[in-house]
UniProtKB/Swiss-Prot annotation:
Epimerase; part of the gene cluster that mediates the biosynthesis of fusarielins F, G and H, decaketide compounds with 5 methylations and a decaline core that act as mycoestrogens as they stimulate growth of MCF-7 breast cancer cells. The initial compound in the pathway is produced by the reducing polyketide synthase FSL1. FSL1 lacks an active enoyl reductase (ER) domain and biosynthesis of fusarielins relies on the trans-acting enoyl reductase FSL5, before it is released through hydrolysis catalyzed by the thioesterase FSL2. Keywords: Isomerase. Substrate binds at residues 125-126. One of its GO terms (molecular function) is aldose 1-epimerase activity. This is Epimerase FSL3. Disruption phenotype: Abolishes the production of fusarielins F, G and H. Induction: Expression is positively regulated by the fusarielin biosynthesis cluster-specific transcription factor FSL7, probably via its binding at the 5'-CGGNNNCCG-3' motif present in the promoter of all the cluster genes. It comes from Gibberella zeae (strain ATCC MYA-4620 / CBS 123657 / FGSC 9075 / NRRL 31084 / PH-1) (Wheat head blight fungus).
């Protein structure tokens, strides 16, 4: 039996035809996926951006990657959550400095998803009774906290627990898009976008929300739990138990935090704004301070509200949990003074947070409430108590129900308005050995 060999030119023609066929098939498959996604999204969420979402590729963990010099980040479109943030520490090791989950699909399956590093909206924090008044009319929204007596972070169908579409995705930027059509009972439709951008050693966050059909309350935030060591903490023997890989040895400075919002035993704002005396467990304004010094400091006396001996707050989980009012000299610019400065002597990494929002919710990770495994690049075991610390920029907590604060122009947005909020995280690394 003889075998006829094709000439090289003919082989090349056939190979090119195969490539063209493969390309056409791939485009058809992609368009089919896009069409299915668009139909599904239009049916369930009414978003015109679903088709575009299907065109943007993810990595093998189902995450979207953006990067610039000195920084690389990954996201999932479930809540627009930050899943990974890599920097090099002072030893030149790449470390992932945020809490998260290994695969994008894990976020939707996480049974107690505490809005893990996602966008928070329409309304960040607690809303007492799930009620508010607007233009002489009372509104009741869905409640999801305190046995149905309060609304937390916009409700069970808050933006941090929703699938967001992708408006655009470039090498160093990603924009998530969401159309909230009266979810959880909030009035009107909120057309919104959230853009994450990285520049050399910097992560920028920008919110833009436009109410349509009816005015409504808007108070956006972005959660991110940081551990600047990336759980790579070492000692003289080179090994540290996971339980010691916390943020206790991180140093924190909140230069603008001379005041805080008083909360009751449930964490709801009472309407009072209190001073933070120098040297108290709330004093992060006078100087940089080791976080563990506050976590380990006993509260000297009996709390007036709960009549129990407390050491710094009313969070039953034992996590640090305080909302600070940011005091700025007028006129001010968000670039003038950072709202927070976090640093780790261990990794040599420092972070400065700048924002145009006027309240800062600081809380440490509560392993008791939300058991969470370390990501595979961070080691073995569970995230320990105080294993991370989050800084949520927002407006004054539950300002809707405290008219004495006169925050209507900051919390109620009409159809002729555009709500915006900007934050930036700037990183630096001390190259000397810690």
């Amino acid at each position: 039996m003889s075998v006829t060999r094709l000439s090289e030119p003919l082989q090349n023609i056939l190979l090119q035809d195969l490539r063209n066929f493969y390309d056409r098939a791939s485009r058809i498959a992609t368009l089919s996926v896009s069409a299915i996604a668009a139909i599904k999204s239009a049916w369930t969420r009414g978003s015109p951006f679903a088709a575009a979402t299907a065109l943007y590729p993810t990595n093998e963990e189902g995450k979207y990657v953006i990067q610039a010099e000195g920084i690389r980040m990954e996201f999932t479109n479930y809540g627009g959550a930050v899943t990974n943030l890599w920097l090099n520490n002072s030893r030149g090791e790449e470390v992932d400095i945020v809490l998260g989950l290994d695969h994008a699909r894990d976020y939707e399956d996480y049974p107690k998803n505490p809005y893990l590093n996602g966008a928070i909206g329409r309304y960040a924090g607690f809303m007492r009774g799930g009620r508010f008044d607007m233009d002489g009319e009372s509104y009741q929204v869905a409640t999801n906290a305190h046995n149905g007596s309060s609304t937390f972070n916009g409700g069970d169908r808050g933006w941090g627990r929703s699938i967001l579409d992708i408006g655009s995705h470039t090498e160093n930027s990603i924009t998530f898009v969401l159309f909230d059509r009266s979810w959880n009972g909030f009035p009107g439709t909120a057309a919104s976008c959230l853009t994450h951008t990285v520049t050399p050693y910097e992560w920028r966050v920008a919110f833009g929300v436009t109410p349509t059909k009816k005015p409504g309350p808007i108070n956006m935030s972005q959660q991110a739990f940081f551990n600047l060591d990336g759980f790579k903490k070492k000692n003289l023997t080179g090994s540290v138990p996971v339980s010691d890989k916390t943020v206790r040895d991180h140093k924190l400075h909140l230069p603008l935090s001379g005041l805080r919002f008083e909360t009751d035993a449930l964490g709801l704002s009472t309407g009072d704004i209190l001073g933070n005396p120098r040297g108290s467990e709330y004093d992060f304004w006078s100087a940089s301070r080791r976080i563990g010094d506050v976590l380990e400091k006993p509260y000297m006396g009996i709390c007036d509200r709960c009549q129990k001996r407390q050491y710094h707050n009313h969070n039953p989980s034992g996590a640090y949990d305080t909302i600070f009012q940011l005091g700025r000299s007028q006129p001010w610019n968000k670039e003038d003074v950072p709202a927070a400065i976090l640093s780790s002597p261990e990794s040599g990494i420092s972070m400065k947070l700048y924002s145009d929002q006027e309240a800062l919710h600081v809380h440490t990770w509560s392993q008791k409430e939300f058991p969470l495994k370390l990501k595979k690049g961070q080691g073995q075991g569970m995230v320990p108590q105080h294993g991370g610390i989050s800084f949520e920029m927002q407006d004054w907590p539950d300002g809707l129900n405290h008219p004495e604060w006169r925050r209507e122009s900051k919390t109620i947005w009409g159809m002729d308005g555009l709500y915006t909020a900007f934050s930036s995280y700037r990183f630096s690394v001390d190259k000397t050995e810690p």
